[in-house]
Structure formats: C-alpha cells, structure tokens
Amino acid sequence: MQLRAGMLMFATLLGAIAAATLLASSPAAEGTMAEGTMAEWPMAEWSMAGVIALVAGITALVTQYWELRPGGSLFFVFAFGAVASMPTQPPIGEAVVTSIVVICWSLAMGMSSRLLGRRFWKPFGWPAGGVFRGDAAAVAYPLVALNVASAAVAGTAALLLSEPWGINHTYWAQLASVVPLAGHPTRLAVNRGLHRVIGTCGGLVIAALASLAHPPLWALILLIALFQGLTELVIVRSYVLGQLFVTPLALLSIELAMQGAGADVHAGALLYDRGLETVIGSAVGIVTVLLPWAVRKVSR
C-alpha cells in the first residue's frame, strides 16, 4: 500500500512539472510571459485550475480503487498545485531522482519497525488487486464527478475573487473543497469541512509566529520536520488539532520551496491567502456534499 501511494505521488509530481512546463511553453503563452513563468499568462491560471480539478477526480478514483489511506485526493491536489505554482520548474532529471530518493526513504522509514523485533514483522507482499466496494460504476462515477465539480467550482470562485480580494493561490481553495468529500456519512463530511476552517485559523497564528521569527534555513527545515511529526501524532484523533500543525507545515514548506526557486516570499500574503481560500473551498465542499443529500431527501 505504501509503495502504491508513493507511485501515485510520483506520477502526480511529474504530472505537475509537465503541466506547468507545457503551459509555459504553449504557443498562446509565447510573447506574453516573462522569463517563461506561468503566472504572466492570464489564461494559465484558468487552465491550471481545470487541470487540478481533473487531478482531484483521477486521484480520488485511484485511492478508492487501491484502498489507500488516508483516502481522497487531498494530498495529491496539494502536491500538484504546490509544484505547478512554482515560478520556475526544476530539470526533469533532478525532479525524478529527488522524488525516487524521498519515496525510497519514506518506505524504509515505514519498514524500520522490523528492527524492533520479530513481533513487529509483517510479511512482504504485493497487495491484492484493487476493488470498489459495491457496484463499480455506482461508486466510481459519483466519486469522480463530485471531486471534479467541487474543485472546479472552488477554483472558479477563487479566480473570480482573486483580483478584488487580492488572493493568489487558487489551488488552496480547490484543496479545501475536496476535504469534505473524503468524509462519510454526510454529517462527518460537513464536520471535516468546518474543522478545517477552525483548525486553519489556529494554525495561521502558529505560522505567523514562526514567520515573524525569520528562522534561518536550517531552523526552517527543523520546524517543518517538527510540524510533520506533530501532525502525524494528532491527525487521526482530532482533525482540528491536526490542522493546527498542517497549516504551518504547508506554509513553511511553500516558503522554503519559493526561496529555493529564487522567488520573493511575502509571509503576510501567504497567511491571508491560506485563510480566505480555505473558507472559500470549505464552503464549496460542504455545499457539494449537501446537494446529493438534499436530492435524496426530496426524492424519498
């Protein structure tokens, strides 16, 4: 299961680099883009929002079919959007090698419990073929449709509001919009959307304190590792508490990546975007969950 998750993430990362590169080099973008960056072409943001919506549907389908945990398209939408939104893309060879090394390291860490003794051993083996619980078509079609629709609507709303409200990270709204879709039943799905907003607000305070400290590079990396560990400790027990640490983890990771890409980092703008787009996306996701529920209630 871990290997399958790594394979899907690897494909997602390469897809993000390919999509950003293709948009930057497309004939429509030539002559309008400065230094080959995607952000200078107005239609690029709309195109990328559409691609991310498709990624949400495809990865939700694959995670359901392979029974990956945690389910849903959340992490893959985040990875795709974060990589594709970078002002410059790394050489493809460098990206491939780095991704493979990190995935192998993660797999090794996952199997490190074997060092504690035989009682922690679990036989190696390729997992059974993927399955859908229940009728395949009845599961697959609504799953893909809801994820694509939710991410598309959230992306559209964020883009339409980007100029008057000054927000610049559309994929954060799309990310928040798919969170409720991983919950079941409807009450749990709505709770996940609300919990994300509440937890994100608290996490923004922690992220602001971390950014105000202006940590050096080595300290920034340690903070990211710390928040990652804290997230893993609490996310299963409490989604709200998990968001307290996921939010600074995500923002500091973006800050680190932008520094590596040579871009200017405005911590205040990142905090503003994260908070506002989380509210937009969560609202869209909750409505997406409630609409089928309302239709079922009326049809009874």
Question: Where are these predicted regions, by residue range?
Answer:
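Alpha-helical transmembrane segments and their membrane-interface boundaries
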Residues: 1-76, 80-244, 248, 253-300
